Amino acid sequence: MSRIIMLIPLNKKVSLTTISLSILYFFNKKEQKNCFKSFSYLPLIKSDNINFIRAYFSKKINVLDDINFFKKNFNSDEYSYLLDKIIKECFNKKKINEFILIKGISRKEHDDADQINFDIAQNIDAEVIFIDNLKDFSLGCFKRKERKINVFLQQKKYKNFLGLIFSDINSPFIFNKMKYNFFDKLIILKNTKKNTCIHAIKKNIFFNSFFRVIAFIPWNKKLVKSSVINIFKFLNATLVNTISIKDAFIKNITIFDEDSSVILKKSYANTLVLISSSRMETFFKTLYLVCKSKKIGAILLTGVLKLSENSIKLLKFLTNQGVPVFFIKENTVETLSQLQKFNFNINVQNKYFINKLLEYTSSFFNKNHLISLKKKTTNFYKKTYSPKEFCYRLKILSKSKHKRIILPESYEPRILKAASICHRLGIAECILLGDPKKIYNIANENKIDLNKNIEIKDPILIRDQYVPRLLEIRKNKKIDEIFARKQLKDNVILATLILESGKVDGLVSGTINTTANTIRPALQIIKTDPIYSLVSSIFFILLPNEVLIYGDCAINIEPNSKELAEIAIQSANSAKMFGIEPRIAMLSYSTGFSGTGWQVEKIRDATSIVKSKRPDLLIDGPIQYDAAISKEVAKLKIPYSSILGSANIFIFPDLNSGNITYKAVQRSADLICIGPMLQGLKKPVNDLSRGASVEDIVYTIALTSIQSL
């Protein structure tokens, strides 16, 4: 199984791109033992560097570049579409890649960066590494940063926090409140003493930290350079000659407007020289002498609309000396104004520089911490899923089943829309029960594109063939043929008989019919699975960060201890069917041995029965809801609990408490609840709420398809 690691910046300036590429570089090194064999890289903001990354890391790294959250409003339709796309990509890539690295969004790139990063990490169940900077290596600075991160973790409840990388330590740029322009930065670099690269730090600084420090990377003056190619791409300038500029760097900028004798005394190595096109011929002789005796970094002609023939001849003398020459239509003042906004960027054209940068950065990684990323043990079952991940998993699992699901309420537009979606996505083969002409008219009136390949069964044409079977099944009730024909006018009963015959694999109803009208025919015709003594139900409660299972909230009014135990076992089996590791809480108004009375004893007995029948299941009860879902509360109330505040299946003592709770949670928090899903029948029949949305119906059809064996 693969791992998804997401790098999340906690500040605007943390060298996120460099660290992302350095992690890829670390695992891509041939001599690196225990490295990942194949991995994917997914930046959330599209970058111009993607093609270079592909070329640099060869075919071993699969770079995903069709996702871009830049300027996408949080929770907009575009945002939701991209989030679904990420979930799909991660789900598919996990099958072929051992390691998926996601580069998060910085606050500089998006105002909602913190919320977007959190939302994506939770929905794809990513393990998270925070990237931050440090003013210096002092203990005080580290502790202040530690407190800040601790507050951030309390605000954003990340499930899988792996550790932290500190970058740009001692950088002169990041902690001054001034906003430096490009020229300021060049001056600071010029005046900054050569910094000493610190390869070892007093480790006692990090011993008592509540988080793991994966790397602490000092700022390095030598690696902060402005490449000529990046500057001229930024200015959208035109290159006069064909000289290669991918290795050229600029440390200074000057304007040729002084006396020739003064100009000749200065050094112009690694300097960008700006000359107004109107003064080029005046300075040509001086320029030629400078180029002949000294190295000029590059020349930029400003205010050029079109080069004259004479100018081109003059420039050839300069280019023959190996000096890159560019021109731009903006004048000198406009060009300088633009350059103020330029920032230091990685020169992806210079592979030697990239190698040095990545080698330097990766040398500070705690190799044991990084290699340990490969040691995660996983299995098919997970403790829980995020809502988006769970819904996507429903679609994928149902697609693999290729099941036929009958829908008896085919005159309801929501049902037709859901059937159309299921057909288009391949979730299930939906069978509509009704008059074809009437169904197509309803679809057209509601602008529903109902594919002609969706099968429609006309009940008038098939009812008679199910009369004998209904008489046989209900012979104990001594019904006659007239009564049987009357019952078969109910499409739910007819659909249930079609299911019983094996011509379809499941049934979904309830948008028009009551729960009783959906379930009663199933109990009478399909009947209970021989391994169970009852039929129960569960709801999937889609919380913002996880999916919980509530049972029984729809069928059994006052279950006894044996029935509660069976409901718990059925719910655990259903959870496993969907890849969820069951951890069951048998709910009560008291926890452990704090309460007495027949209601508590019923829960205690039910828990004992489950433990006896299924010792493989994690279960605790009697337990209160807060102790079942909160680790902090569990440590106080029931520290010996086998689930310790991490339950994902909640079994309610009766229908009254279960139904009230699920509806209160759903409505108060505006959540999606999928269900009720029936358990214990020989074949899957599922009920819909009469207020079910099209999305609810689609997911219920998917659930039913997955239940079909």
Curated annotation (Swiss-Prot):
Species lineage: Bacteria, Pseudomonadati, Pseudomonadota, Gammaproteobacteria, Enterobacterales
Location of region: Phosphate acetyltransferase: 389-709
Tagged with keyword Protein transport: no
Name the UniProt record assigns to this protein: Phosphate acetyltransferase
Similarity comment: In the N-terminal section; belongs to the CobB/CobQ family.
Source taxon at top rank: Bacteria
Function noted in UniProt: Involved in acetate metabolism.
Pathway: Metabolic intermediate biosynthesis; acetyl-CoA biosynthesis; acetyl-CoA from acetate: step 2/2
Listed GO biological process terms: acetyl-CoA biosynthetic process
Any single Pfam family the record assigns to this protein: AAA_26
Quaternary state and interactors: Homohexamer.
GO molecular function annotations of the record: phosphate acetyltransferase activity
InterPro entries referenced in this protein's UniProt entry, alphabetically: DRTGG (IPR010766), P-Actrans_bac (IPR016475), P_AcTrfase (IPR004614), P_AcTrfase_dom1 (IPR042113), P_AcTrfase_dom2 (IPR042112), Phos_Acetyltrans/Butyryltrans (IPR050500), PTA_PTB (IPR002505), Ser_kin/Pase_Hpr-like_N_sf (IPR028979)
Catalytic activity, EC: 2.3.1.8
Main location per the UniProt record: cytoplasm
CC per GO annotation: cytoplasm
Domain-level remarks: The N-terminal region seems to be important for proper quaternary structure. The C-terminal region contains the substrate-binding site.
Reaction equation(s) it catalyzes: acetyl-CoA + phosphate = acetyl phosphate + CoA
Keywords (A to Z) from UniProt: Acyltransferase, Cytoplasm, Transferase
Location(s), subcellular: Cytoplasm
